[in-house]
Amino acid sequence: EELKNAVNMTQAESANGIIIDPNTGDILAIASIPDFNPNNYYNYNLNSYKNRTISDSYEPGSTLKIIPLISSMKYNYDIENKKYFCENGSYNLTHINKLNDHEPHDSLSIKDIFIHSSNIGISKIVNEMNLKDIYQLCLNFGFGTKTGLPFKSESSGKLRSLSNWSKTSKTYISIGQEIGVTNVQLALAYAAIANGGFLLKPHIIKSINNNHKNIYSRKVAPIRQIFNSSLSDTILNILKDVVDNGTAKNLNLNGYNVGGKTGTA
């Protein structure tokens, strides 16, 4: 219902949403609009049959700024206390590539760059990073790979091999461009931040019982640990600051600890 309300309010052509338990990978809710009634499916066009949460990949925008943020700490770039000049909102990355921020900033720390979602600040940060570190972190998060859900329509997203990256790719991928992800991939990435750094396999079925006899129970088994719990706690606090003081203030719920990141796909 909330998804439908959002579609009506924004007049969007489509929308999808997913809720995952970050400790188990269980998919608690999943929705895609437009949808259809299976009792009279023949009255709908093929576009309504898609579960966009798993079948559609898109450029995730600033939600992927977790990549340079985590990279800076995971690979010990020692830039946590540095400040970066954000060019007051406009910056020529190359003679043909220009970056703009949604609001002008002077100099910001890496934490404030993330909180205020500065594209220019991100470009300055990744300029000090190894291309392979950013690529490897994308791989570790599972981008470019199917999650293993039992649906033939699942998309693997799009992550080009490192040999096909240009000189500006590490900047554009770090601001969520030149890469395609599905919403389930992105949800699992943020779940890893919430659970101590573990990428989990998603589950749509928790158990199956027949005549009170259990014939199937899903097993919670991490695919890999991407980073340690200490780094996870640090990122969670920064995500909370995004909601409390940054671009996601509208997500602030009194009485609840909420963390998040805005992004324009």
Where are these regions (language model features)?
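Conserved, well-ordered alpha-helix/loop/beta-strand core segments that scaffold catalytic motifs
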Residues: 1-15
